[in-house]
Amino acid sequence: MFGLQNRSGSCWVNAALQAIFRFPDVQERYSSNTFEAGNVIDECLMKMWNSKGTVGLHEFHEAVRTDTMPAGLNVGDSHELLNYLCDKLPFLDELCRFKIAHSMECVHCKAKTTTRDSVIEFTLDSVDGRNVPITTCITKTVQPYNIDEWECEKCKKRGGIRQQLIGSFPEYMMFHLPLPNTTVDYSSILILNGKKYGLLSVVCYNGAHWWTYGRNMPPGSSWFVLDDTHVVEHGPKQFPVSAAMRVLIYYRLDE
């Protein structure tokens, strides 16, 4: 584990990078000096990994900087940067992307339509309360719910049931938690449709500062707080739970 320099409020950049540097596939890729020719972001990440953060960070800021992501100039959003990196790094997108479906069924004539899409994260619905299990948040997000004002194109009557479903399960499952009124009780091991996932990294935000909790695989390895240049090791069972968790990334474990 290594730290990253904070340049003019770039904690959000560091938090996102530390999250993906925990991916075993990312570690293997960059340890073998592999990167896509002509992809500056990919090359910068490879340099950062192999130099333990001493080379490549400034060039990375220059490569990803936009009006909404002021890397190296001001505070931005780690969650937004993670999405951006998946867009710019095809190998990362492939590791994280999965299928979802949205269905709408008329409560009167039972006509049903389904739209399908692919995404790189699953945004969880808000569940008010403290210490809400992440499994409860997932269940609520995929439960069907009524939309009384929806009008059926077939029978022209109002009232429908909408539902979101997960259609495939990627190597890395990223959950986004826009839950200001919820303290999520994470699970270190998560079973999704028979697939076993281990918690790998967690991106946190307290309203002013971003940082990451992370560990290497296999499960049972020590957790680390990765906060800019500050790297603090905790035991494997001493994950420092925080109400500031915003992105949880799970790694699919092969049986």
Spell out what each predicted region is:
Residues 47, 94-97, 135-136, 187:
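Polar/charged alpha-helical tracts
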Residues 1-89, 103, 249-250:
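USP/UBP deubiquitinase core
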